[in-house]
């Protein structure tokens, strides 16, 4: 049996925070605002995986109203989601991700993101694709107000 899930997330930029995307710290003047570390890409992958197994979304499992998850490491959240995936008997077929950001440039960091995501999903790097695009200065990402991300995941039993 195969299952497909889709994820999407958005976070706005904020002063005084680290920018962590795909489990990788990226040098930049701002970070992303969120209850956890606001890793927009790992949140997207978690949502896609939860959707594929019919377990809701990241907000259901790690609500921003719970102080336990304040400043949480999103890698730990994704690892917890992956345990649910494994409990249901699934492994990764592949995951395809897109980061939507005007700045900073993501290309230099994509190999490290792929490696970290593969590690978290107990998979080979060949099963993980990460790409980045801009919105050609249109919308909130184009104005440099934040970053969006989307992912599609294929799980196999």
UniProtKB/Swiss-Prot annotation:
It comes from the Bacteria. Its EC number is 4.6.1.12. Its cofactor is a divalent metal cation. InterPro entries: MECDP_synthase, MECDP_synthase_CS, MECDP_synthase_sf. HAMAP family: IspF (MF_00107). PANTHER family: 2-C-METHYL-D-ERYTHRITOL 2,4-CYCLODIPHOSPHATE SYNTHASE, CHLOROPLASTIC. Belongs to the IspF family. This is 2-C-methyl-D-erythritol 2,4-cyclodiphosphate synthase. It comes from Halalkalibacterium halodurans (strain ATCC BAA-125 / DSM 18197 / FERM 7344 / JCM 9153 / C-125) (Bacillus halodurans). The gene is ispF.
């Amino acid at each position: 049996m195969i299952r497909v899930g889709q994820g999407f997330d958005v976070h706005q930029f904020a002063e005084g925070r680290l920018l962590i995307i795909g489990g990788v710290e990226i040098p930049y003047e701002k970070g992303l605002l969120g209850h956890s570390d606001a890793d927009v890409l790992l949140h997207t992958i978690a949502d896609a995986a939860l959707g594929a197994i019919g377990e809701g979304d990241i907000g259901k499992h790690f609500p921003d109203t719970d102080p336990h998850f304040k400043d949480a490491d999103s890698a730990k959240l994704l690892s917890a989601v992956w345990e649910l995936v494994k409990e249901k008997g699934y492994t990764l077929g592949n995951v395809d991700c897109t980061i939507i950001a005007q700045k900073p440039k993501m290309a230099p960091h994509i190999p490290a993101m792929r490696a970290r995501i593969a590690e978290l999903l107990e998979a080979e790097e060949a099963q993980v694709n990460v790409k980045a695009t801009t919105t050609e200065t249109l919308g909130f990402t184009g104005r440099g107000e934040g970053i969006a991300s989307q992912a599609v995941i294929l799980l196999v039993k």
